[in-house]
């Protein structure tokens, strides 16, 4: 039986793809859970329209992310923390701290988009990538200074 997938299914296919499956698998699993629809001509047109709308939406979001990346590249964020004699911080600077500092500069960036491998624990200047979209990355500079 041929069905059109409405979402990505591991080991079967991706959203919008036409696949052949066993009739029982389609009737008992895919169709009741609305993971697929029967491959009729009307459903093919509907799925194609949904795919086009999804593609337009993705293109718009990516364009906005690219514009934001151009603006954000080169942005410098200064964070003051208490530190000891050997430039070791008492605590650390996390992606949440960086996101809060960016919000103070009117950049509303989710902390999960800040690609910080591990919290910053020393004073200094760091280049931090910010993943704004799947393949759109802006690089910001974070300066961690000693709090007076």
Swiss-Prot record:
Keywords: Ribonucleoprotein, Ribosomal protein, RNA-binding, rRNA-binding
Gene Ontology MF annotations: rRNA binding; structural constituent of ribosome
Ion transport as UniProt keyword: no
Keyword check for Cell inner membrane: no
Biological process according to GO: translation
An example Gene Ontology CC term for this record: ribonucleoprotein complex
Top-rank taxon: Bacteria
Family assignment from sequence similarity: Belongs to the bacterial ribosomal protein bL9 family.
Its biological purpose: Binds to the 23S rRNA.
NCBIfam families linked to this entry: L9 (TIGR00158)
Protein name: Large ribosomal subunit protein bL9
Gene name tied to this protein: rplI
